[in-house]
A protein has these predicted regions:
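N-terminal FAD cofactor-binding segment of flavoenzymes
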Residues: 20-78, 219-221
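Flavin (primarily FAD) cofactor-binding/catalytic cores of flavoenzymes
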Residues: 1-35, 39-40, 87-365, 377, ...
């Protein structure tokens, strides 16, 4: 039997896609999972067990769509029992709750998963994938949802002498009265430092890149406040430090480690420092070793991710797709495809892309009257409750297409996919399209949000909307394959964009002008 779709990995992304395929019921599919449980990654990681994906059951709203803005852990489902907020009220949950949630999700959705089926090889013969996992499975399409499953190790002589994040001890008493170097400046490094501050005599964090704060960049993979206690101990002269520079070499003797640094911001070219322990917390990468030469995907970003098209397909292997954290290659350190609260929507979009491409199924759309009022009302209603555009800012869009008197509203379309492929159907050859996104201002990550001397535009002021730095709706009018006009809705402290004179009336006027061909 040749499957329509074979999914490798039963983590959050693999389960999300499987649940969509199961509910749709039109495709033969199977999920292969090497472990005995779904979501096995979370049984080990993060090592210190606290997730940094927020969980807020108490939102003041009974709208499940709106509430997903503050629920970063749930997968998409119509079953209210499968909301992660039912599992714990902790704002930063324990990873064991995620393991339990994913097991329940797999069981209650009835997805087809083969556990204990670790994939050892993938090849492609005459256009069909052959996947070896004890036995051989054949599939027309393969979706890789394995996550970043191998440690990313920088090229440092002697790095093999150090301890890895994956298997280092996490009991702080194991580091009592020791000097510790942590290589890395991401959340895993700071999470580790935070855990060891009470028992070590000194901790240094080292890396060539600047520490970037998530509250400034709006990228949730940058350093989160929940992990940044270490910064206090550094800047308040409490024994610890951050070393900005490159580790040149690591050696080890009976008394510990000697580490050679080349500093980025100091006068000395190199310096040697002594440590009792060296821990490597430099993140993870995609493991492409299972693919043979017939279908080995091209890699990108220091070979950490597969290179992908706007359809999350391998750039060099047709019909090989990716789902989950691997898809952050398309918006690396810019949006949220590296995280559940982002890629759950990307997986739903991928399912629609696959059905459109292989099943000749149009993107779901609601018909509207082709008037400024009708289109603006639909846009206003959506931007005030959508979680997808909220979480996947500047990456996913709602798209309203207009062909004469026929307007259609399409939800959650990848911006790059629409730009390249469009949404035309045999009965809807549109001339105009309105692409609706939520976006920050172009230099939002250059502004200190806590600096009261920084001038900001006033909220709810129509004439200043285009200068807004904070998240706000943007509507772009496309005609003839290019953007011909842009309209910004004024930012608002409560993220409500529905004031008649501030948001609604200007948007109606913009759409009407565009439909008349007058532009912006």
């Amino acid at each position: 039997m040749t499957l329509d779709c074979l999914i490798i990995g039963a983590g959050p992304a693999g389960l999300q896609l499987a649940a969509l395929l199961e509910a749709d019921g039109r495709r033969d599919y199977l999920v292969l999972e090497g472990a005995d449980i779904p979501g096995a990654f979370f049984a080990t990681y993060p090592r210190h067990r606290q997730l940094i994906s927020i969980n807020k059951p108490h939102t003041g709203s009974d709208d499940p769509e709106f509430n997903l803005r503050l629920d970063w852990n749930s997968l998409l489902t119509d079953d209210p029992a499968l909301r992660f907020t039912r599992y714990t009220e902790r704002y930063f949950p324990d990873a064991d709750q995620m393991v339990r949630y994913l097991a329940d999700f797999a069981a209650k959705t009835g997805v087809k998963v083969r556990y204990g089926a670790r994939v050892t090889s993938v090849s492609k013969v005459d256009g069909i994938f052959e996947v070896r996992a004890g036995e051989t499975f054949r599939a027309r399409r393969v979706v890789v949802a394995t996550g970043v499953s191998r440690p990313y190790l920088p090229d440092i002589p002697g790095l093999e002498l150090a301890e890895q994040y994956a298997d280092m001890p996490v009991d702080p008493r194991d580091y009592l009265d020791q000097k510790v170097l942590i290589i890395g400046k991401g959340n895993s490094a700071f999470e580790t430092a935070d855990n060891l501050m009470e028992t070590t005599t000194l901790i240094h964090l080292a890396g060539p890149s600047s520490v970037r704060m998530a509250w400034r960049t709006h990228y949730v993979g940058h350093l989160r406040a929940v992990n940044n206690n270490f910064l206090d101990t550094y800047q308040l002269k409490s024994a610890n430090a951050i070393l900005d520079g490159t580790v040149r070499r690591i050696t080890r003797d009976a008394d510990g480690y000697t580490v050679t640094f080349a500093f980025s911001r100091a006068d000395e070219v190199t310096k040697e420092l002594r440590y009792d322990r060296v821990l490597v917390c430099t993140g993870f990468a995609f493991d492409a070793s299972i693919f043979d030469g017939s279908c080995r995907p091209e890699l990108a970003i220091r070979d950490r991710f597969p290179a992908q098209t706007a359809q999350w397909e391998s750039v060099n292997v047709p019909d090989l797709f990716f789902a989950g954290t691997l898809t952050q290659q398309r918006d690396f350190k810019r949006s949220t495809n590296g995280f559940i609260h982002g890629f759950r929507y990307a997986v739903r979009a991928l399912h629609r892309i696959l059905e459109r491409r292989y099943g000749d199924t149009a993107w779901p759309a609601e018909k509207l009257d082709a008037t400024g009022t009708s289109i603006a009302d639909a846009v206003i209603a959506r931007v005030n409750r959508t979680s997808a555009l909220w979480q996947q800012f500047d990456v996913l869009a709602d798209v309203v297409t207009v062909a004469d008197a026929d307007a259609r509203y399409h939800e959650e379309v990848p911006v790059d996919y629409f730009t390249e492929t469009g949404l035309r159907t045999a009965d809807h050859d549109y001339s105009d399209a309105f692409v609706v996104t939520l976006e920050y201002g172009p230099e939002h990550d250059q502004v200190d949000p806590f600096d009261v001397t920084v001038k900001r535009v006033a909220q709810d002021v129509v004439g200043q909307a285009h200068d807004a730095a904070y998240l706000h709706p943007v509507v772009r009018h496309h005609r003839g394959g290019r953007v011909v006009a842009t309209h910004h809705l004024a930012e608002n402290l409560e993220n409500r964009w529905d004031r008649p004179q501030v948001h609604v009336t200007p948007l109606v006027a913009f759409v009407d002008r565009c439909l008349r061909g007058a532009g912006d």
